[in-house]
């Protein structure tokens, strides 16, 4: 798996942004005539993440001995086949590369729908969000954090990363004027800050 190789090369600094796009162009890139409906994309994402994590776990942490003197490269007793047969995927495994340095790369999910928040609550270390108001952001935070307990996770195991578009001015008035100008050319609401 190329991604796992990148994680090794970077010393465990790679992250995986799990995207369940609704783009019809993306569907065509994967041999699909039409894109699956929203809910089905998230069901598929849950299974896909399970498969990928299972493949990452196919080698135990200490499976690779790499002893040149004895020519003992790896311990075959510490390799496991995945043998996953699910609704969308059938994968035997194992991978042909060691576990990532930190176990798994950081998993990021960016979805504000109920399905997206559920996927993040079950699988992600980070969720990206772009709420329009402070009140919406606080409600999102509380909602997504409350989903972790049913998966045996604590609120500390999921970081919420808000999308912020700062507009800076010498005064608050300058920032608001810049914000107004920018809003005319953007479909995103922007919060003003003065320095």
Where are these regions (language model features)?
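Amphipathic alpha-helical segments in well-structured domains
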Residues: 3, 42-45, 49, 137, ...
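Flexible loop residues that form catalytic
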Residues: 112, 132, 187
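Glycine-rich nucleotide phosphate-binding loop and flanking beta-alpha elements
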Residues: 115, 134-135, 190
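Internal, glycine-rich beta/alpha segment that forms the wall or movable "lid"
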Residues: 8-123, 151, 155-156, 165, ...
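Single conserved hydrophobic/aromatic residue that forms the stacking wall/gate
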Residues: 1-2, 180, 184-195
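Gly/lys/ser-thr-rich phosphate-binding loops in alpha/beta enzymes
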Residues: 5-9, 134
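Short alpha-helical segments and helix-capping/turn motifs at coil-helix boundaries
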Residues: 3-4, 92-94, 144-148
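Glycine-rich, aromatic-lined ligand/substrate-binding cores of catalytic
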Residues: 119-146, 150-153, 158-179
